[in-house]
Swiss-Prot record:
Belongs to the beta-2-microglobulin family. This is Beta-2-microglobulin. PANTHER family: BETA-2-MICROGLOBULIN (PTHR19944:SF62), MHC CLASS II-RELATED (PTHR19944). CDD domains: IgC1_beta2m. GO terms for cellular component: extracellular region; MHC class I protein complex. Residues 1-20 form the signal peptide. Disulfide bonds join C45-C100. SUPFAM superfamilies: Immunoglobulin. It is found in: Secreted. Heterodimer of an alpha chain and a beta chain. Beta-2-microglobulin is the beta-chain of major histocompatibility complex class I molecules. Keywords: Disulfide bond, Immunity, Immunoglobulin domain, MHC I, Secreted, Signal.
Amino acid sequence: MARSVVVALLVLLSLSGLEAIQHAPKIQVYSRHPAENGKPNFLNCYVSGFHPSDIEVDLLKNGKKIEKVEHSDLSFSKDWSFYLLYYTEFTPNEKDEYACRVSHVTFSTPKTVKWDRTM
């Protein structure tokens, strides 16, 4: 009985220690298909490798937040870091700029990554 209590306490202590570990998210912005002006596509922002799980992700068009955005469920990897995919339908053209802005405890200010249409 005493041994199982000690084991349970060790498990709880190790789990509480996970919250202290912080990892900055990796941000990847890409389109589902190669960009063609005037042709509908999907803009994706894949955010991975972050811890803790609290995160704010916005897709931007010309610096303004896009309202109609969907995202995957929060998931975690084998190393207990988290990942998410945010996406929206869009139609690229020559004049509009698209980006993904991420706020996380590991950043002193939000980080913005622009979509490179050549990637």
